[in-house]
Amino acid sequence: MMITLRKLPLAVAVAAGVMSAQAMAVDFHGYARSGIGWTGSGGEQQCFQVTGAQSKYRLGNECETYAELKLGQEVWKEGDKSFYFDTNVAYSVNQQNDWESTDPAFREANVQGKNLIEWLPGSTIWAGKRFYQRHDVHMIDFYYWDISGPGAGIENIDLGFGKLSLAATRSTEAGGSYTFSSQNIYDEVKDTANDVFDVRLAGLQTNPDGVLELGVDYGRANTTDGYKLADGASKDGWMFTAEHTQSMLKGYNKFVVQYATDAMTTQGKGQARGSDGSSSFTEELPDGTKINYANKVINNNGNMWRILDHGAISLGDKWDLMYVGMYQNIDWDNNLGTEWWTVGVRPMYKWTPIMSTLLEVGYDNVKSQQTGDRNNQYKITLAQQWQAGDSIWSRPAIRIFATYAKWDEKWGYIKDGDNISRYAAATNSGISTNSRGDSDEWTFGAQMEIWW
């Protein structure tokens, strides 16, 4: 009996430790891709994106090692009320050597509190850096609605007919505003904070298995006292989004219409660039000295239209399919906008529940508003893949691939005084450009991809 009693405190301590470990369990999520590739004409793998487009078809066309490592934990819970702490650190290297150092990007650090407001059951309040309700096309790694960044908000307010979310986030432009109170040029340029205010109404039932989401984003440049924006800067802008999601064929189809103005047109995803101004402006100092400040960003006064349809569906036991079709027109007052349309498919044939063959075919066409000339490219990738499951979304996956790309480009980009590409222009203008001309290339390699 004495032996039993002596063992009791140890047993209690062990049990308490186990229970504590379970209560403090950390959620580990993330994403990663890495591989090796070669180019037919020699050297390491090249990747292909048509000049003027904002994305590329990604299968067999990614030349970097990239990872996002997310750690999170529910740190407090009482009934249906809880606090959750979430973090995300991202890394990207060129996958050229064994030892490749990089500065990590601290992309998320936020706290989310659920059911904390008694009269708004089911809602979540949050603050910090966060990936906020992002909308993207996986096939081309294109985010068309993404206001992520430092911010705060409340989401999923149940209105009965839909759920309302309100948020404010920030994105900052380097060297976007100027002051002339100092003789030191290094004190005269300051980063410009852009504030975005986001309102979304989701879950609106429109038809059987179909829902609608509506959103309005307003973004504006928020300058520090004593600083001002360049003449012609757009200062602010709006973006309106309507997205219909239809559940179908064991997958979904999303149809999206977006319209943006001025500061919201540069990135076209809900983040503002309000200090984009005129190409240059001159100020005279008190001593009579004149200084010309080159504004190394595009004047983005104008508008953007985007019509997008994309999805992922199952076509039977053996076939899955991803697809995308998009038209985007950026019409700027300075005539430096673009018209971009793209269409692509990625069918998957499943030989076994863990082995498949994928074919990705994508075409891009981008027209210069200034000249009317067009750049175009098509890319074809054939890949043999082994994945953890029989879905086109199953990961991890290991694949070997061969890619062929053919392009014909008629225009490039004007370069500023620092030889940095900034403005869309035609090659026949006589100005230095980086148009790729008319050529083709093929690559081959192997890649892993995982999310968890």
From Swiss-Prot:
Subcellular location: Cell outer membrane
Entry annotated with the keyword Ion transport: yes
Domain of life: Bacteria
Keyword Membrane applies: yes
Annotated catalysed reactions: beta-maltose(in) = beta-maltose(out)
Site feature Greasy slide, important in sugar transport, where: 31, 66, 99, 252, 393, 451
GO molecular function, one term: maltodextrin transmembrane transporter activity
Gene Ontology biological process terms from the UniProt entry: monoatomic ion transport
UniProt induction comment: By maltose.
SUPFAM superfamilies: Porins
Marked site (Important in sugar transport) residue numbers: 143
Signal sequence bounds: 1-25
Topology class, membrane: Multi-pass membrane protein
First-listed, main subcellular location of the protein, grouped into a coarse class: membrane
GO CC, one annotated term: pore complex
Record key words, sorted: Cell outer membrane, Ion transport, Membrane, Porin, Signal, Sugar transport, Transmembrane, Transmembrane beta strand, Transport
Protein role: Involved in the transport of maltose and maltodextrins.
PANTHER family: CRYPTIC OUTER MEMBRANE PORIN BGLH-RELATED
The family this protein is said to belong to: Belongs to the porin LamB (TC 1.B.3) family.
Subunit structure, interactors included: Homotrimer formed of three 18-stranded antiparallel beta-barrels, containing three independent channels.
Protein name: Maltoporin
Organism: Salmonella heidelberg (strain SL476)
